[in-house]
Amino acid sequence: MSHQFSFEKLEVWYLAKEFSKRIYAVTKKFPIEERFGLTAQLTRAAISVASTIAEGSARASKKDQAHFSQLAYGSLMEIACQLIISCELGYLNNTVYQEVRDKMEKISNKLNALRNYQLRAFSSQAKRTP
């Protein structure tokens, strides 16, 4: 296998990437008039989660990495809000909504765990620095 970037080794990145593909599939069924509304918002935010995890992995300090993990979490919460609205507008049925929500919960838990690890590692580095 060819070289893997550090973000490609993160399970949370893989889950976020797969999640973004699922969001694309789900939003294809939205009304055409939502193409520049909810559809665009959801797909951009979904891509942002995986992309921000990748970008954060390239940061030199654990503090910066944790900041990007927090930004990715923020994008995930944006998606949560938009999915609730989509469901209430009748664009998603409850089964699809719950399936996507379950995936988000798993990503959310892993993102929080990653961020906590990064912050602990930063704290350890700061304590060792004279």
Regions found by a protein language model. Name each.
Residues M1-E55, R59-P130:
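Short, C-terminally biased terminal segments at protein or domain edges
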